[in-house]
């Protein structure tokens, strides 16, 4: 069996692809894979480190308004589709999967024109431009949020969830908090703003640290590498208690997520898939800097189901974040209700469901 996969630009498109590959290998250990991405996207480094064969094409995204740059983008798309056809003819895959990002546009389009079975995976609650375009040509569209179903033909939709969810379920969180100087068994809040951190979240947390110092529950505050030294210096005279741990980055996030009580974070699709798979309540602060404001749409889907509280970044300064945390952690009924709601939204079997869907279109 040969499988070609394309997706990139951000980790949110790459990590679901890798989770799918790992799951398919369990069922078909003999399967061969080829990843098609760009050299400029995150996928180049991540995929190569995984030891997966990698081919690259050149492509940029369409602007959401009329632009001369879009003419160049069309030319790059056609060139990318031509190169993709060459790559696919040589590799001869049984199926081609797109996990989002501009790069999968020419790849999946080329595969469809070559009559190769195709599937695209939409991680967000609002469809990306590339996936909207590709859905006309693909055999199936795998989705993670019911809210996005109106963007695609109903007969093509399969609700699989995000395969990254499957990778956090069953991970042992024992000892995870101790590695960061905290204690197991105590209510613990994890705050993080993504791999690079988020200035808005950092500023809000710094403002309430004196109050947090008076609380019994623990805080694992992940600043992001870029912000760590500056924040560490500013906290030098605050005399934080042992129940507060400030870190630049967390490398064992699946273990940590299995050990914490509440999460304060952005609302990227991968993060939400992990939180719901584990039934972890959250306070979500969507990034305002993403395409089509898709993180807020993602967050509102959880809020609507009582799995999260949403605070937009523009509301952060007027919102008492400490009071929001207190309201959840000091109300056991509310906390348990949010846990249950998050768990009900989760798809811990997402990777297997996606594998089954892919295998079905190959028959």
UniProtKB/Swiss-Prot annotation:
It is found in: Cell membrane. UDP-N-acetyl-alpha-D-glucosamine binds at residues 10-12, 124, 195, 250, 295. One of its GO terms (cellular component) is plasma membrane. It is a peripheral membrane protein. Its EC number is 2.4.1.227. GO terms for molecular function: UDP-N-acetyl-D-glucosamine:N-acetylmuramoyl-L-alanyl-D-glutamyl-meso-2,6-diaminopimelyl-D-alanyl-D-alanine-diphosphoundecaprenol 4-beta-N-acetylglucosaminlytransferase activity; undecaprenyldiphospho-muramoylpentapeptide beta-N-acetylglucosaminyltransferase activity. The keyword rRNA processing does not apply. Pfam families: Glyco_tran_28_C, Glyco_transf_28. It catalyses: di-trans,octa-cis-undecaprenyl diphospho-N-acetyl-alpha-D-muramoyl-L-alanyl-D-glutamyl-meso-2,6-diaminopimeloyl-D-alanyl-D-alanine + UDP-N-acetyl-alpha-D-glucosamine = di-trans,octa-cis-undecaprenyl diphospho-[N-acetyl-alpha-D-glucosaminyl-(1->4)]-N-acetyl-alpha-D-muramoyl-L-alanyl-D-glutamyl-meso-2,6-diaminopimeloyl-D-alanyl-D-alanine + UDP + H(+). GO terms for biological process: carbohydrate metabolic process; cell division; cell wall organization; lipid glycosylation; peptidoglycan biosynthetic process; regulation of cell shape. InterPro entries: GlcNAc_MurG, Glyco_trans_28_C, GlycoTrans_28_N. Pathway: Cell wall biogenesis; peptidoglycan biosynthesis. Keywords: Cell cycle, Cell division, Cell membrane, Cell shape, Cell wall biogenesis/degradation, Glycosyltransferase, Membrane, Peptidoglycan synthesis, Transferase. Belongs to the glycosyltransferase 28 family. MurG subfamily. Cell wall formation. Catalyzes the transfer of a GlcNAc subunit on undecaprenyl-pyrophosphoryl-MurNAc-pentapeptide (lipid intermediate I) to form undecaprenyl-pyrophosphoryl-MurNAc-(pentapeptide)GlcNAc (lipid intermediate II). PANTHER family: GLYCOSYLTRANSFERASE, UDP-N-ACETYLGLUCOSAMINE--N-ACETYLMURAMYL-(PENTAPEPTIDE) PYROPHOSPHORYL-UNDECAPRENOL N-ACETYLGLUCOSAMINE TRANSFERASE 1. This is UDP-N-acetylglucosamine--N-acetylmuramyl-(pentapeptide) pyrophosphoryl-undecaprenol N-acetylglucosamine transferase. It comes from Listeria innocua serovar 6a (strain ATCC BAA-680 / CLIP 11262). The lineage of its organism: Bacteria, Bacillati, Bacillota, Bacilli, Bacillales.
